[in-house]
Amino acid sequence: MADHPLIRDYGADAIFAWRDGRPVGVNQFLRDVTQLAATLPDRRHILNLCADRYRFLVGFSAALLRRQISLLPPNHTPNLIDQLARQYPDVYCLTDGEDEHPALSTVFYPEFPDYTTVVAPPVPSIPATQIAAMVFTSGSTGEPVPYQKSWGGLVRSARAEAERLGLAAHPGMVILGTVPPQHMYGLESTVLLPTQNGLAMHACRPFYPADIRDELEALPRPRGLVTTPVHLRALLAEPVRPPLADFLLCATAPLSPQLAADAEARFAAPLFEIYGCTEAGQVATRRTVEAADWRAFPGIALRQDDAGTWAGGGHVETEVLLADVIELRDDNTFLLHGRTADLVNIAGKRTSLANLNYHLNSIEGVIDGVFVMPEENGDSITRLTAFVVAPTLSAETIMNALRQRIDTVFLPRPLCMVDALPRNATGKLPRQALHELVTNLAARAG
């Protein structure tokens, strides 16, 4: 299998990235990668904790040159890092922060001089079969499990994404992301998507609506935003109109058609959703205002058996059993009906937590909300519970709205108003976080 270049489709004077309000050229990036690669220890595995997206990419690229595998766990808690240290004894940490982890030797990201006037080294090529990263399941379906990602698979994914989303119509677009690069969605769509298609990446990761608006407004057009439903909902809840954009991309949970239409109108840009998982990477897309169906990427085949739905082919190098209930419409289009583990059966009636969450979050005034089915506990009756962030609404108002949307057997008992939900950096709610919510509720009630 052929090699693939580290970066692709950049002219000599092209802007490669934006950082601290200033453009970074291709020459600077290639010099930074070469310099950092020369300083990395001779190890097999690297834990790249750089929060700055540009520095993360320099570290990821330098590791590729040294044939090192980047470990990308779902979180960076001390317990998980200790677990990685036991599982991969030679792993070391690259960070641009001040924290050191006792279990790991640490390399602090150095400051490099300005190389803009120096001739850059040539763009290196990386073997397609080289293992570039080890990504881990998010923890929302159990304990993290590692999955290898080859450089060739990652490159094919990034190029297929750009083609599907029509980004050739926006040469030089700057991609701003609200998701971290250490997660599969962030790696694919805020790091590899721009660098394999001649686009510019943005180094920062704004979180609050005002910061997202400010960072996006400061960028030249064309500009795109890669985000999550949580960030998007918070942005649109603000009275301030967001800056115009040329492209919106969302993932980690399905959007409602209403929210998607509102986003397209407010940003004056098309919004696309990505469906995927850590195990397979990105699998399908849809433009939510046009269709509920998802369309698989070229080359990806879906098949079903008694175990569920499998995805393989294209950039998905090993066939993967998807964790969702999927209705195949034809060879490459399908509908999602929630996660397999989310099916709820009460009084002979069936639905999914995803469907219930959809209706809960479609209520005007609900900023965030989630249904939870607690684990059965002895002889006590297990009831659906909902946790809702809605500062302007009462629990009674929300319950009345739910009665208009869902069968009464699925109404939450209780419905708990909270200040915020414990989402992780990509907007997901890990199983352990939901368990703690329910446990704390039971402790207060008991």
Language-model-derived ranges and their functions:
Residues 25, 124, 132-159:
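Conserved AMP-binding A3 loop
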